[in-house]
From Swiss-Prot:
The active site is at 442 (proton acceptor). CDD domains: STKc_EIF2AK1_HRI (cd14049). Residues 167-583 form the Protein kinase domain. Residues 285-294 have a biased composition (Basic and acidic residues). The lineage of its organism: Eukaryota, Metazoa, Chordata, Craniata, Vertebrata. It is linked to Leukoencephalopathy, motor delay, spasticity, and dysarthria syndrome: A disorder characterized by delayed motor development, speech delay with dysarthria, hypertonia, progressive spasticity, hyperreflexia, and bradykinesia. Cognition is normal. Patients manifest anxiety and attention deficit-hyperactivity disorder. The gene is EIF2AK1. The keyword Transmembrane helix does not apply. This is Eukaryotic translation initiation factor 2-alpha kinase 1. Its EC number is 2.7.11.1. HRM repeats lie at residues 410-415, 552-557. InterPro entries: CC_SR_Kinase (IPR050339), HRI2_3H (IPR054521), Kinase-like_dom_sf (IPR011009), Prot_kinase_dom (IPR000719), Protein_kinase_ATP_BS (IPR017441), Ser/Thr_kinase_AS (IPR008271). Activated by autophosphorylation; phosphorylated predominantly on serine and threonine residues, but also on tyrosine residues. Autophosphorylation at Thr-488 is required for kinase activation. The active autophosphorylated form apparently is largely refractory to cellular heme fluctuations. Ubiquitinated and degraded by the SIFI complex once the mitochondrial stress has been resolved, thereby providing stress response silencing. Within the SIFI complex, UBR4 initiates ubiquitin chain that are further elongated or branched by KCMF1. The keyword tRNA-binding does not apply.
Amino acid sequence: MQGGNSGVRKREEEGDGAGAVAAPPAIDFPAEGPDPEYDESDVPAEIQVLKEPLQQPTFPFAVANQLLLVSLLEHLSHVHEPNPLRSRQVFKLLCQTFIKMGLLSSFTCSDEFSSLRLHHNRAITHLMRSAKERVRQDPCEDISRIQKIRSREVALEAQTSRYLNEFEELAILGKGGYGRVYKVRNKLDGQYYAIKKILIKGATKTVCMKVLREVKVLAGLQHPNIVGYHTAWIEHVHVIQPRADRAAIELPSLEVLSDQEEDREQCGVKNDESSSSSIIFAEPTPEKEKRFGESDTENQNNKSVKYTTNLVIRESGELESTLELQENGLAGLSASSIVEQQLPLRRNSHLEESFTSTEESSEENVNFLGQTEAQYHLMLHIQMQLCELSLWDWIVERNKRGREYVDESACPYVMANVATKIFQELVEGVFYIHNMGIVHRDLKPRNIFLHGPDQQVKIGDFGLACTDILQKNTDWTNRNGKRTPTHTSRVGTCLYASPEQLEGSEYDAKSDMYSLGVVLLELFQPFGTEMERAEVLTGLRTGQLPESLRKRCPVQAKYIQHLTRRNSSQRPSAIQLLQSELFQNSGNVNLTLQMKIIEQEKEIAELKKQLNLLSQDKGVRDDGKDGGVG
């Protein structure tokens, strides 16, 4: 009865006018909570349950979609206005109109994406031609004809790639978690360069803006001890996208073990973006302890590579196999290079298997057993100065020469003057990038190069300096929203990374100084085996130094300990190092004096030349005066 009265009272409240006074409820109902969750397991995928009132639809920002729309506008402008200047004006006007309508962002209409729009325009033209051909054909046409058209569309992407059109890929120089570096030859000028390719996943506006900003920062680095920058551009690439409704087929693909992964495996760190502060060393093999640097040489001679099952192929009829590119006349590209350039591989942790094979059998193992879908991602290409000799190679060669010396107290093969010159140029380069507000975060001998006959130091591989492009856990802002050089992500190579990097705490430019301390030790302390090197470099974290180094190089040993202090605030800065006694010892003073003497001799010779010219001019004038008097 009470429930019926409450229902009557509720109806009276709903139907009563403004002057009615609402009576208190007879039952105290609990406060309203969130809407109940409904079981949607039996709802077809094409039907979506409406949980909220209808709202005005919004247009989510998708860079790939907006770039395609901008390319369509530019294509239409060229079709309807043959004059290039007027076509450009029409295109700008259309972009402004779409921006005002909220359909486009001004960001996607910028000139930085002109190469991508050119790629789209060519693909659109080819697509229109293919569509016309398809309409003119018999509707009952064989499916092989459609597959050939699709294969040509994929081939078109390779033909419109600036990287494939302008450069000949010769060798891979290095690979890490942030991209691969290739040695290439420019087809026009015949010169050799290094090109780094970085796959940008999830191309949002924020990510693209960071990429462009960081590229401009790297382009502004002009210093004798920094690897030279030439240009950069962005291209579209296919990325394998597995279908969830098909059975997975594993595909082994060629993958060279990177330098960073090798160092991580030595330290017992898993191959991911984070590293651990606990370092575990592998036991030496019972046959013999591996010599320092021998692993690289043996791998190169035997062409031993590492295969990783990191690609998932699922059966579908959506895309033609990229191996057909080779059959359709793309000469000069191996199967592995086509897969790498056109279909950057997508790692699947559940199917990851590793096995060792040889390079000759790579093409036999790369087989597309099924068909796949593809997603478009952006690939950043950075063209740089080619430096093939790294400081790591130099140290390995020096250590090989030094094994014939038994007396460690002498160590003539260390070449103190050369090592000091290398370290001084390295510190000058680090001082420059720190003044530019950049923290390298991965300084190690493999990322330091010696260029030219005078072996000038060049700092390269700024991949980790741009980690905030690809990593979400990097903190570049403070509470005021201003950019600061303080970071919290665990990046770097474990033997050279500072304690704060390995612990994942905040770090700054002083982390690079720790890495410099480790490099300084390697320059003045030779190692016979890799195990010995790992033990000594790890001992730096507790202040341990080889006694032979303390006796031979007391000044260097002193600054190695200063640079590798656990408290980052107690480490010297780059400018403090340059002004220290480290570069003011007797050997350096003699070298500096010799350089000054050479410069003074050149200056004296130039002055003598000028005096001779002046005396000749004076003699000519005197002869003229004498002739006039006569």
